Amino acid sequence: NGKNPIVAHEFLGDNIDGKDIIIIDDMISSGGSMLDTAKQLKRMNARRVFICCTFGLFTDGLDAFDKAYEQGYFDKVVTTDLTYLPPELYSRPYFIEADMSKFIASLIDFMNHDVSLSNALATTEKIHGILEAYNNRTNIEFLTRD
């Protein structure tokens, strides 16, 4: 039937009470498992929940996401522009598009110049910069609810 039933969501780690949580997956198909996870995290008193994926397909439409957002189960959905996104998604207050055009252009440029892709793919320093900005609470207004 195309569905992948999830038997259980298990959380391993410290208490998440009052913390911001990021759920990361490669793809949102219908979004059911992501929304179930977000709901469970909110029940565990997560402060904010951010859903992130590479490919946001939204095969069952946006109604379930709209309802879950209205119920406060998540704060933002971030997905790349590496696949078709339904036009109505852009009007949703919870949606953030991660523009990958510069990254893809860099990959093409590296390949055209026969240069190793390792520098383009080694994003550890960028991640550390984002975490530092977050920890300093600077330049993160895009993460707040509208």
Descriptions of predicted regions:
Residues N1-D146:
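PRPP-associated nucleotide enzymes
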